[in-house]
Structure formats: structure tokens, C-alpha cells
Amino acid sequence: MLMSWSPEECKGQGEPLDDRHPLCARLVEKPSRGSEEHLKSGPGPIVTRTASGPALAFWQAVLAGDVGCVSRILADSSTGLAPDSVFDTSDPERWRDFRFNIRALRLWSLTYEEELTTPLHVAASRGHTEVLRLLLRRRARPDSAPGGRTALHEACAAGHTACVHVLLVAGADPNIADQDGKRPLHLCRGPGTLECAELLLRFGARVDGRSEEEEETPLHVAARLGHVELADLLLRRGACPDARNAEGWTPLLAACDVRCQSITDAEATTARCLQLCSLLLSAGADADAADQDKQRPLHLACRRGHAAVVELLLSCGVSANTMDYGGHTPLHCALQGPAAALAQSPEHVVRALLNHGAVRVWPGALPKVLERWSTCPRTIEVLMNTYSVVQLPEEAVGLVTPETLQKHQRFYSSLFALVRQPRSLQHLSRCALRSHLEGSLPQALPRLPLPPRLLRYLQLDFEGVLY
């Protein structure tokens, strides 16, 4: 239920209705950081919500990209409008009850948040190239940033290549940081921004320019967003594949941490992640680089369920048993991953780790694993096939829901029938051979003169039943 108070209810006894505490008045009128530059050099910003006359017509013409109207208004000196006129797009009405909010709701806000922009920024963000050219011809400053961002930041974020080119030709700084410490190249992140990045690099943008707080390079951003083409461009232009941000993350760590947004895009996400990781590794990235928490690419790929990436990293020789700062191995990460990893074949991740010498799950933790992954019987199957005995308590059947038992009846019937019972001789032989070759399984198994079917059996091929 929404609650509201009228000014009469909130004002103190004997105080006039429109009275405002001097401190509140100073706080409300305090300029924001982004407005300081403009307030030092010209009149106050035009509030778009209350604008009228030529100011309103100018604002609407810029929004619409009407270059003729913009030109006519700027040609009329009596309007007092200029190419660098600053507009405030915030809503000042929300601050009128500022004093009453403080007193009745105990809410505090130290500054009046202005949202400042210029016609140049609006034209750049909306792709109005001709308006942009007109404003620049009339001496609009390309690096003006009353709201904390330049027009070049806006054009790059929106992916307007033509606007980016116009601004760069006009002298816009390709390495300037915005209020968040990000440079234009950091904002080339969406579809259609590859050409913007190429232009920035051609006009002198630093390929490894770092953001001010996170200390991230553009390659970190491309890797985190799964932008394969941009990562390829940056690497070809000399980006460092092992650059570290403030938390010690390399682009490879960021790439391995790419998450699927839904079950339906899991396969496509893993495919992009694999492309990125292959690209970074071929450029010389360290496959075993650790961050400040000792997390390695393998930990993150396992946690996100990227089976193909796990296989790639293991083929590079990284250890399947390295622990992070919290004592988690890659196998722990795979089994503790989010539920979305179910769509990304966790059984393939688990099998790859076990076939590369990962230490098995402690038997006492198997009931918890069964409860967590009961809807994915292949994951349970591959884990149980590394033991000579099914080490589950007899009451473990209660950990699986009746619906899951019914759906996977054949597998779970075979599983619970083997609790504390001897396994088949064939399975025991597999366990003995794998134990004998422990530490060299990936190299030794393919070299054995065995039929393909038997080789797959030794490599824990899925059968859908336990013997």
C-alpha cells in the first residue's frame, strides 16, 4: 500500500507552508559534479521540463534531428541559444517536498542530481549526423561533458559509427574518461560497435587504456560480454592477453565467467565462450592465471558449466585439482554451480575432470550431491562409476523426489539396488585400471590397443544404468 503525506501534515507547528530550512535549500541548490564546468563559464542549464519558446523549439528540433530548424534557431542571436547550451533533463518537481521527506520519512539525499546534456550529446546518441556536423561547424566543443560524458562516449555506446567518425575528425579525444572512469573504447560493447572501435583505434585510442576504478582494459570488457569479433580486433591491434584489472582478473578469467541468460541460449553462450578462450590462448594468454582469490579459468568454466571450455583448458595442461582461496577444486565448482548449469551438461564437465585426474568426491558428501543433481542422472552415474562400491546410505532413496524416480526409473532402480552391494567384475576391472593409471589417464588411455567401445567404457561413457 502506498502512503503519502501532505505538506500540512509534515510541517511543524507555526511554520509557514512554503517555508524551507536553509540547510535544505543549500543542499537542493548545490550543483552536481557534472554541472561545475558549465556553471563556471555560462548561464545555468535550461530545464527541459519547463522550457518554452525558442529553447523548447531548439530542444525538440535536436531530438528530432531537424537540421533546418536547428540551423534557423542558432542563426537568430536574439534567442540566446548556442551549440553548447546545456539542458537539464532531470525532474525538479521531485525535489519540492525535499524538506518534508526528510522530516516525515527520514530520507536523506545530499545533492540535487542534475542530468545535464547538450545538443551535441543528443545528436550523437541518436545518430543525427547532420545535426552533429552543424553544431561542430558552429564551434560546439567536441569534448564538452557537463553530464560527465562526452558526445563521443554517447556515440560509441549507441553504436553510431558515422557520428563517431565526425567527432573524431573534429578533434574529439578518443582516450578521455567519463564520470565513471571509462573511455570510449570501453563503451563499444553492443552489436554494431565493432566499426566504432576500429575508428577509435585508427584515431589514436590506446588499445590497453584502463578504466580508472576497475582498471579494466577494453579486452576485459569484450571478454566479459562474449564479444568475439571485438576481442579479435583488439588482440590484432596489440592488446595484452594477460592484462590484470584491480581484482587480478585477466581477460581469460572474464571469458570463462560468461553466464548464460537462459536455458535456451546455454549452447550458444558456451560456443562464444569457447571461441573467446581459444582466441586468447592462441594469443598467449596464461591458461592457469589466478586472481586475488586464487580462482583460475578452470574454476570459473566449471562453475558456469562450459564443458567444451573445460576440455580446452585441461588439454593445455592445467591441473584438475588446484584449489582456490576457499579450498574449492574445479570439481567442487562444477557440482556447486547454479541451476542454469543443468542446461550446459554438468555431467560432461564432471567426466572431463575425472578423466584428467580430479580427486573424487568425498563419499560422505555423496548424499548431498545426489540431492542437488538428482534430476541429472548422468552426473550421478559418472560420479558413482569412480567407486568400486556405491557408497550411499540406504535411506538415500528419500533424497530423490518421486517425480524424478519415476522419470528416471531404470537408472535409479539400478543405483539403489547396488547400495553396499558388490559391483560387476567388468566395473571393478575398470576401477582397477583407472587407479593404476591415475595421474596419466589422458595420455595413457588413448594409447592402449583397445576397441573404441571398450576405450569409451574406460573413459566413463554414459550408459544410463549402473552394474
Swiss-Prot record:
Tissue: Expressed in the eye. The highest expression is observed in the iris, with moderate levels in the trabecular meshwork (TM), the lamina, and the optic nerve; slightly lower levels in the ciliary body, retina, and choroid; and very low levels in the lens.
Pathway annotation from the record: Protein modification; protein ubiquitination
Domain SOCS box: 412-464
UniProt ANK repeat ranges: 115-144, 147-176, 180-209, 214-243, 247-289, 293-322, 326-361
Gene3D superfamilies documented for this protein: Ankyrin repeat-containing domain, SOCS box
Signal peptide: none
Domain of life of the organism encoding this protein: Eukaryota
Key word Cytoplasm present: yes
Notes concerning its domains: The SOCS box domain mediates the interaction with the Elongin BC complex, an adapter module in different E3 ubiquitin-protein ligase complexes.
Family, similarity comment: Belongs to the ankyrin SOCS box (ASB) family.
Disease link: Glaucoma 1, open angle, F: A form of primary open angle glaucoma (POAG). POAG is characterized by a specific pattern of optic nerve and visual field defects. The angle of the anterior chamber of the eye is open, and usually the intraocular pressure is increased. However, glaucoma can occur at any intraocular pressure. The disease is generally asymptomatic until the late stages, by which time significant and irreversible optic nerve damage has already taken place.
Record-given protein name: Ankyrin repeat and SOCS box protein 10
Organism: Homo sapiens
Gene name per UniProt: ASB10
